[in-house]
Swiss-Prot record:
Keywords: Cytoplasm, Methyltransferase, S-adenosyl-L-methionine, Transferase, tRNA processing. Specifically methylates the adenine in position 37 of tRNA(1)(Val) (anticodon cmo5UAC). This is tRNA1(Val) (adenine(37)-N6)-methyltransferase. It comes from the Bacteria. CDD domains: AdoMet_MTases. The keyword Transmembrane does not apply. One of its GO terms (molecular function) is tRNA (adenine-N6)-methyltransferase activity. Its main location: cytoplasm.
Length: 245
C-alpha cells in the first residue's frame, strides 16, 4: 500500500511505520499515549510489558524503538480491544515480537515466571462518576476494574530490580499517584511535566518509577510554541512516529 493511500485510512491513526485501527477500542489514539510511548526509557531493555494495551499503540511504539531481540507482552482485559490490538500488530513489522494476552492483569501476573525491564501503562484515572456510553469505555476511563494501588502492586510483582514502570496521568492525579507509589516502596526516577504552551500550567505528567533508589531527573515539555507549531522538544521526541513531522 502506498503512503498516499495509507494516509487516507479511516477508523485509526497512521504513523510513519505502522497503522493503529481503534474503532473497536473504547479509548482512541491520543497525545497521552503517543507521549508515553515516545518518552519511556528503553536503553538496555530485553522484555517489556504493556498493561491495559487497548489498541496496541504503546506496544507498537516500543517495538519500533527497541532492538529486534526485545520481546513485548501486551495485556488487555476487554476482548474487542485485544482482538483489534492483535490485528494491528499482525499488520505491523513486529508481529513476531509482540504477544497479546486477553486477560485480567492481576490474574495474568500470577502465572508469569519472567520479569520485565520496562513496564508501561496509560492507566484509567477517573473515579466512578458520570455514566459512560458503553461498559467498555467505562472500563477504560475509570479505576473500578484496576485501581492505582492494584496497578502498582502488579508492576512490583514482575519488574526487574533496575527496571522502570512508566505511566502518563493528569498533573494532579499524577502527584497523588507518586505519593502512593512512594508509600509502596517505589522510587521516582524520571518526571516530565507537560504543558500545551509556555503560558499554560502543566496538564499531564510522565512518570518513571523503579524498585531501585537513585537520583530523580525532572524536566518540562512544552508541546506548542508561540506560533502554535510543535516545539523543537516535542518534535524531537515524537518525529520518529508522526507521519508529517
Amino acid at each position: 500500500m502506498s503512503q498516499s493511500t495509507s494516509v487516507l485510512r479511516r477508523n485509526g491513526f497512521t504513523f510513519k511505520q505502522f497503522f493503529v485501527a481503534h474503532d473497536r477500542c473504547a479509548m482512541k489514539v491520543g497525545t497521552d499515549g503517543i507521549l508515553l510511548g515516545a518518552w519511556a526509557p528503553v536503553a538496555g531493555v530485553k522484555r517489556c510489558l504493556d498493561i491495559g494495551a487497548g489498541s496496541g499503540l504503546l506496544a507498537l511504539m516500543l517495538a519500533q524503538r527497541t532492538d529486534d531481540s526485545v520481546m513485548i507482552d501486551a495485556v488487555e482485559l476487554e476482548s474487542e480491544a485485544a482482538a483489534q490490538a492483535q490485528e494491528n500488530i499482525n499488520q505491523s513489522p513486529w508481529a513476531e515480537r509482540i504477544n497479546v494476552h486477553t486477560a485480567d492483569i492481576q490474574q495474568w501476573i500470577t502465572q508469569q515466571t519472567v520479569r520485565f525491564d520496562l513496564i508501561i501503562s496509560n492507566p484509567p484515572y477517573y473515579q466512578q462518576g458520570v455514566e459512560c456510553s458503553t461498559p467498555q469505555r467505562e472500563q477504560a476511563r475509570y479505576t473500578t476494574t484496576l485501581d492505582h494501588p492494584s496497578l502498582l502492586a502488579c508492576a512490583a510483582e514482575c519488574i526487574t530490580e533496575e527496571g522502570f514502570f512508566c505511566v502518563v496521568l493528569p498533573e494532579q492525579i499524577g502527584n497523588g499517584f507518586t505519593e502512593l507509589a512512594l508509600s509502596m516502596g517505589w522510587h521516582l526516577r524520571l518526571r516530565t511535566d507537560v504543558a500545551e504552551n509556555e503560558a499554560r500550567l502543566p496538564h499531564r505528567v510522565l512518570l518513571a518509577f523503579s524498585p531501585k533508589a537513585g537520583e530523580c531527573f525532572s524536566d518540562r515539555l512544552i508541546i506548542r510554541g508561540s506560533d502554535q507549531n510543535y516545539s523543537e522538544a516535542y518534535t524531537a521526541l515524537t518525529q520518529a512516529f508522526y507521519l508529517f513531522m
